[in-house]
Curated annotation (Swiss-Prot):
InterPro entries the record matches: ClpS, ClpS_core, Ribosomal_bL12_C/ClpS-like
Protein name, UniProt field: ATP-dependent Clp protease adapter protein ClpS
Biological process terms in GO annotation: protein catabolic process; proteolysis
Pfam families documented for this protein: ClpS (PF02617)
Species annotation: Marinobacter nauticus (strain ATCC 700491 / DSM 11845 / VT8) (Marinobacter aquaeolei)
Gene that encodes it: clpS
Primary role: Involved in the modulation of the specificity of the ClpAP-mediated ATP-dependent protein degradation.
UniProt xrefs under HAMAP family: ClpS
Gene3D superfamilies referenced in this protein's UniProt entry, alphabetically: 3.30.1390.10
Superkingdom of origin organism: Bacteria
Stated family: Belongs to the ClpS family.
């Protein structure tokens, strides 16, 4: 004998007409379509005082980059004035930017990080 698992249909043997029930079969309500959350870029800004090694350290520590990738992003910050460190949902982007700004301040560097909407 076979068993039915995860069935969405329920058979009704009663004769009562109830909303949502047709011919002895109950129809599961449709799940609402979920909207993807907005995405935000975390952007590191260049300054003339923060050492390049510190920027690489920040990228490795807060954005889980390896040394090679962190160096590439640091050079983009240095040559273009800013670079994207990652794209996240708003809460995560705000948290990462705040962590970088706090860490930089504690280490007495003027390095700044901000977020901007990506989509």
């Amino acid at each position: 004998m076979r068993t039915i698992e995860n069935s969405l249909l329920v058979f009704n043997q009663g004769e009562d007409e109830q909303p949502g029930r047709h011919e002895g079969v109950s129809v599961a309500p449709e799940k609402p379509a979920l909207k993807r959350p907005a995405r935000y870029r975390v952007v590191l800004l260049n300054d003339d005082y923060t050492p390049m090694d510190f920027v690489v350290d920040v990228l490795m520590k807060f954005f889980a980059m390896n040394e090679e990738k962190a160096t590439q992003v640091m050079l983009l910050v240095h040559t273009q004035g800013k670079a994207v460190c990652g794209v996240y949902t708003r809460d995560i982007a705000e948290t990462k930017a705040a962590q970088v700004n706090q860490y930089s301040s504690e280490c007495e560097h003027p390095l700044l990080c901000e977020i901007e909407r990506a989509d």
